[in-house]
């Protein structure tokens, strides 16, 4: 049986997979579940993983696969079969296969590689005319391009210097999503996006860095993170 928070989290992950094709970030899960810290998300994910509901895909950030799903919430209404506090925070489950239709494992597509992007202070986003071969299974629907990550400000999100960030083109994003933000029409950076009191805040995922705050007209969303590729030397 799952706790109510575990049930809520797996439902949220499934919803985001169906909507966007990628699992939510830890920041998005923290906000969706109204948790105070990302450590609470880590504990919930570890518990779901131990119980065989999800698994983390190796060498990929924001890569969660649902293996089975909770079906019925126990507690309240006609389905309440338990009593007291236990019934209010525990859910009964029936296993069900996750609805995933992965691309053939050998399918490779080439997407544009547009230079380097800062996971630190903003740097110029280069428009190099190169391409990057990517397993099709890593990409969902939409138009994509790649940027090579420079810096360490997103390491707590599993994004490291030298990684290739796979970006889905879009000019809009929700709070808490990792985006490519063009600042003052000349510099690009990879950060969590937040809107706060009429300002735009670009948050790092590294306690050594401070958030960057701008007026809305200074920041243009040019895409959001869809996946990562990493080279091992």
From Swiss-Prot:
Q: Which residues are connected by disulfide bridges in this protein?
A: none
Coiled-coil residue windows:
none
Which Enzyme Commission numbers does its entry carry? 3.4.21.88
Query: What keywords tag this UniProt record?
Result: Autocatalytic cleavage, DNA damage, DNA repair, DNA replication, DNA-binding, Hydrolase, Repressor, SOS response, Transcription, Transcription regulation
Which SUPFAM superfamilies has this protein been placed in?
A: LexA/Signal peptidase, Winged helix' DNA-binding domain
Q: Which residues bind DNA?
A: 26-46
> Could you state a single Gene Ontology molecular function term?
serine-type endopeptidase activity
Q: What class of enzyme is it?
A: hydrolase
* Positions of transmembrane segments: none
Per the record, the GO terms for biological process are: DNA repair; DNA replication; negative regulation of DNA-templated transcription; proteolysis; SOS response
Active-site positions, per UniProt? Answer: 153, 191
Q: Where is this site: Cleavage?
A: 119-120
> Which reactions appear under catalytic activity for this entry?
Hydrolysis of Ala-|-Gly bond in repressor LexA
Family of this protein: Belongs to the peptidase S24 family.
Quaternary structure annotation from Swiss-Prot or TrEMBL: Homodimer.
The free-text function statement in the UniProt record for this protein reads:
Represses a number of genes involved in the response to DNA damage (SOS response), including recA and lexA. In the presence of single-stranded DNA, RecA interacts with LexA causing an autocatalytic cleavage which disrupts the DNA-binding part of LexA, leading to derepression of the SOS regulon and eventually DNA repair.
Q: Which PANTHER family match?
A: LEXA REPRESSOR (PTHR33516), LEXA REPRESSOR-RELATED (PTHR33516:SF2)
* Name of the protein: LexA repressor
- Organism name: Erythrobacter litoralis (strain HTCC2594)
Which gene carries the instructions for this protein?
lexA
């Amino acid at each position: 049986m799952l706790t109510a928070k575990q049930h809520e989290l797996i439902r949220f992950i499934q919803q985001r997979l169906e909507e966007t094709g990628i699992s939510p970030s830890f920041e998005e899960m923290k906000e969706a579940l109204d948790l105070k810290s990302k450590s609470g998300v880590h504990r919930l994910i570890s518990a779901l993983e131990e119980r065989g509901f999800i698994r983390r895909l190796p060498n990929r950030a924001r890569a969660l696969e649902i293996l089975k799903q909770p079906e019925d919430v126990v507690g309240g209404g006609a389905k309440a079969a338990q009593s007291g506090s236990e019934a209010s925070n525990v859910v009964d489950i029936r296993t069900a296969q996750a609805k995933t239709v992965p691309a053939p494992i050998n399918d490779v597509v080439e997407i544009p590689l547009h230079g380097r992007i800062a996971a630190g202070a903003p740097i110029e986003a280069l428009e190099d005319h190169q391409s990057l071969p990517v397993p099709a299974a890593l990409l969902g629907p939409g138009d994509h391009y790649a940027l090579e990550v420079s810096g360490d400000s997103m390491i707590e999100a599993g994004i490291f210097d030298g990684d290739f960030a796979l970006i889905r083109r879009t000019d809009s994003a929700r709070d808490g999503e990792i985006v490519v933000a063009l600042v003052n029409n000349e510099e690009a950076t990879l950060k969590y996006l937040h809107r706060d009191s009429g300002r735009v805040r670009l948050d790092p995922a590294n306690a050594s860095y401070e958030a960057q705050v701008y007026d809305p007209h200074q920041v243009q969303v040019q895409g959001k993170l869809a996946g990562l590729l990493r080279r091992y030397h």
